[in-house]
Amino acid sequence: MSVPVQIATVADHVAGDVFTAAMWTSLEDNINQGIVEQVGVMVKRTTNQAVASASTVTLSFDTDVQDVYGMWALASPTQLVAPVGGWYDVGVQVTWAATSGGGGPFEVRFVQNGTVQVIASTGIQSDGTHATQQQHSCKLYCSVGDVITITVLQRTGGTLNVTGATATLVRV
């Protein structure tokens, strides 16, 4: 999926060109746009998503919180797409339903173009009354059109719901 993005560039000029007021205004606008309209997306999941024990499940998002450059689409709810090349901060916050089972830590995996790049884990609240929350982030270098997905894994012995999740992909 290709997303057209206009990033400010230095205009072509030759030695001796006069820097006009219009050129100054254009440069100022491009700089301000680059600061204010940072390339990034934030999406969230507002309903439960079931995760069977010992199964890797790709998080699916249902709400666009902020998406300046069309990096997420409801038609492909699991995918965050890099519109321009560069370094990105990928972040996720996942809330799991309370469980009284054990089974080891919950895992979050950051996946780039189908390949797992980072695995992060969090110990679980196993008292049966408190939810487990995970918050992880990493830096990934993306080319134009790279697809980032986030998967989760739990090993409690039964199906457990992700009760909420928020993900971000922001160019740094």
Show where each model-derived region lies.
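Extracellular jelly-roll beta-sandwich "head" domains, especially the C-terminal globular C1q domain
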Residues: 2-172
